[in-house]
Amino acid sequence: MTPLPVVLAHALPELILAGGVLLLILIGAIRGKDSDGPMTELAVGLLGIAILTLVLGTKTQAVLFDGSFIDDAFGRFMKVLVLIGSLVSLIMGQTYLAREKIDKFEFPILILLSTLGMLMLISATGLIALYLGLELMSLALYVIAAFHRDDVKASEAGLKYFVLGALSSGMLLYGASLIYGFAGTVNFTGIATALHGETSLGVVFGLVFLTAGLAFKMSTVPFHMWTPDVYEGAPTPVTAFFASAPKLAAIAITMRIMITAFAGIKPQWQQIIVFISILSMALGSFAAIGQTNIKRLMAYSSIGHMGFALVGLAAGTETGIQGVLAYMAIYLVMTLGTFAAILSMRVNGVNVEQISDLAGLARTRGSMAFFLAIMMFSLAGIPPLAGFFAKWYVFNAAIQAHLYPLAVIGVLCSTVGAYYYLRIVKVMYFDDPAPAFDRPTPTLAAVLIVTGLAVLLLCVYPGSFVEATTVAARSLF
């Protein structure tokens, strides 16, 4: 049994969120509707405390709970990103949810529950812990997707996500059972030992199903079909959350399981990851070109970006993992900044989502147009912004691993994808002005400015960031 001081030292963020959820449920049950506003503030406070415990807490590595949970530099890095994504999504959505009269006290609780599942998922070192974390994350997401019950599109989005999510969970569970049957253990290190020097066809089949289940959570091709409809139909703060935190958790556990459990069959899983990466980059680049709704465009953009991130994982090296970590951190900043701008798209108190509504924004809301243009240039990978260095990291790792065709395809897809990002900049700066947007709330303006500055300054002062990704990647090997 793990001693209590060790548990407190290495699983404190999870304990804070778990205890906080119970406390918030109790407050909500007692105070009812009167607790709607304070609940969000309390949830933000809990997420902030969890971030501080990770940043300021112990830096040693420990395995807890009979080998099913690990606290290492890799996990801490990804957990900080997930918590930041959840915290900013909650902050950005508070005014929107109140305006739409859906600011129920259950919303921040569901965000916290989903985030707790993500933290468990990132630290999982066994198939059972992986499945428990994944389901805790997913069950809350199903409800959040359909949180706007009076909106038909939101209800449709929630139903689609639930049905396809249940299918993907079944595939993952079937893959886990195959792996357990052929390896004789559910622990990642035990699986690696069982596969040492031997390749079992049954394990490879299990890995395919396991990867399919995780690919659904990452919204990569061919398990992406839910993404555009859910992103468009769900409330915009929910879409911002979907586009950030769950993807980080899913790609984190994918990296952990491939590097630690299946290192012995790297050529086999490398082919799977390369296949998913190429399809995701291609679809994300080409399918977004014809989109007119900016939330659907961001859905295809996220599919493409996950494909680019998987280029680093396909390399299967420490440099590749470092590239993925850097890519996901930069992707998080760009995504949150873009959704802060999307949430600010309101005309006479009504939300608008069409790209044409951004016409002439530079003349009506110049500062908003400037920072949104920075996000678009960075998402397109234009140097010297952070998005360029994100892609450079993963393509460099692919070249070092002699995956030249993958790197070339990635560069070509990035070039094609730049078109629809630059089209938004063109609409904002060169088209005749559409009706002016309402003044953004101070919170959304602050998020847009901070993320914009981060994208600009990351290329100037990369030292601490690169060092953090290096330490995190090294701890996985």
Curated annotation (Swiss-Prot):
One of its GO terms (biological process) is ATP synthesis coupled electron transport. GO terms for cellular component: plasma membrane. The chain crosses the membrane at residues 7-27, 37-57, 77-97, 109-129, 162-182, 201-221, 233-253, 272-292, 297-317, 323-343, 369-389, 402-424, 446-466. It is found in: Cell inner membrane. The keyword Transcription regulation does not apply. GO terms for molecular function: NADH dehydrogenase (ubiquinone) activity; NADH:ubiquinone reductase (non-electrogenic) activity; quinone binding. Belongs to the complex I subunit 2 family. This is NADH-quinone oxidoreductase subunit N. The lineage of its organism: Bacteria, Pseudomonadati, Pseudomonadota, Alphaproteobacteria, Hyphomicrobiales. The gene is nuoN.
